[in-house]
């Protein structure tokens, strides 16, 4: 069997171009927002898609995008933050208590280790809020209250941030 390396390279380039166009169209269809992070531009694209889907209650799609951002940048704390919130579906009554903990533990075994991967105070605040949600024992109501209290601290520090 004959192989054509140039053809394979051309096919790979075309796939990349098409994928980029699909991502741009997909991003456009879920709205626009500004959620800057310390992630690489490649990971940021998937992170923003994840946030868009999360805001649109597309939990499965959001989870996929956050995991893609993690594949691109394994220590991208905000991608784990986002995934943490894809396991709670408030409108259909689904609640998975274990997966948010598992998600954050993939980023780091301890809070200190996880926070060391969040390079800005803003990202540390978001990550602390996700930890409050994931690791507070008890009902989903208790977890949401812990998350709300932690987010009030983020708001106090970054009140001009729309997120």
Locate the predicted segments by residue.
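Inter-helical turn/loop elements of alpha-helical hairpins
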Residues: 57-64, 83-120, 128-142
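Bacterial N-terminal signal peptides
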Residues: 9-21
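Alpha-helical tetratricopeptide repeat
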Residues: 40-54, 81, 125-127
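Residue-level recognition of tetratricopeptide repeat
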Residues: 42, 76-77, 160-163
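Conserved structural position within tetratricopeptide repeats
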Residues: 68-71, 109, 156
């Amino acid at each position: 069997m004959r192989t054509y390396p140039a053809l394979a390279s051309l096919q790979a380039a075309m796939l990349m171009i098409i994928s980029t166009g699909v991502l741009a169209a997909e991003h456009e269809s879920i709205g626009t927002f500004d959620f800057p992070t310390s992630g690489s531009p490649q990971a940021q694209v998937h992170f923003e898609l994840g946030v868009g889907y999360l805001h649109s209650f597309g939990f499965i799609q959001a989870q996929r995008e956050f995991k893609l951002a993690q594949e691109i940048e394994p220590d991208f704390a905000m991608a784990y933050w986002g995934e943490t919130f894809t396991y709670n579906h408030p409108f259909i009554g689904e609640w998975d208590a274990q997966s948010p903990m598992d998600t954050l533990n993939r980023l780091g075994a301890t809070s200190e280790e996880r926070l060391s991967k969040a390079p800005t105070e803003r990202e540390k605040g978001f990550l602390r809020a996700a930890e409050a949600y994931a690791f507070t024992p008890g009902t989903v109501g208790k977890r949401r209250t812990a998350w709300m209290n932690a987010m009030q601290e983020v708001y106090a520090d970054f009140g001009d941030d729309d997120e």
